[in-house]
Amino acid sequence: MFNRNLRAVILKNYNKALTRCLHDAGNLKRPTPPRLPKEQQEEWDRLQKESSKRPVDVMRREKHKDFEGDVNPKTGEIGGPKSEPTVHGDYSYEGRVTDF
């Protein structure tokens, strides 16, 4: 009986201490880089705001083509793919990978 009570007291105190540590860990002030001189800091802040406003439109970028026209100059293939499908070691077309 004494062991059960002792175990309960130890676990209760342990849980309190653990909860306190985890709670306090979120309130720590993290070190930040030193501020720049006023003019440079204003320019830095302005550039940060500008860069966050314009999203990167990756999907609309023009895809790289190895050649122009309908005939592949290396293989003589007519109407085949415009770019090498195994650039990354997989057969992929417009981001979709096939394995056969």
Swiss-Prot record:
Coiled coil region boundaries: none
Protein's organism: Schizosaccharomyces pombe (strain 972 / ATCC 24843) (Fission yeast)
Protein name: Succinate dehydrogenase assembly factor 4, mitochondrial
Any one GO cellular component localisation term in the record: mitochondrial matrix
Mitochondrion recorded as keyword: yes
Subunit relationships: Interacts with sdh1 in its FAD-bound form.
Keywords: Chaperone, Mitochondrion, Transit peptide
Family: Belongs to the SDHAF4 family.
Biased composition (Basic and acidic residues): 36-68, 85-100
Domain of life: Eukaryota
Region of interest (Disordered), residue spans: 24-100
Main location: mitochondrion
Feature: transit peptide: 1-31
Location of the protein in the cell: Mitochondrion matrix
Pfam families registered for this protein in UniProt: DUF1674
An annotated GO BP: mitochondrial respiratory chain complex II assembly
Task of the protein: Plays an essential role in the assembly of succinate dehydrogenase (SDH), an enzyme complex (also referred to as respiratory complex II) that is a component of both the tricarboxylic acid (TCA) cycle and the mitochondrial electron transport chain, and which couples the oxidation of succinate to fumarate with the reduction of ubiquinone (coenzyme Q) to ubiquinol. Binds to the flavoprotein subunit sdh1 in its FAD-bound form, blocking the generation of excess reactive oxygen species (ROS) and facilitating its assembly with the iron-sulfur protein subunit sdh2 into the SDH catalytic dimer.
UniProt KW Acyltransferase keyword: no
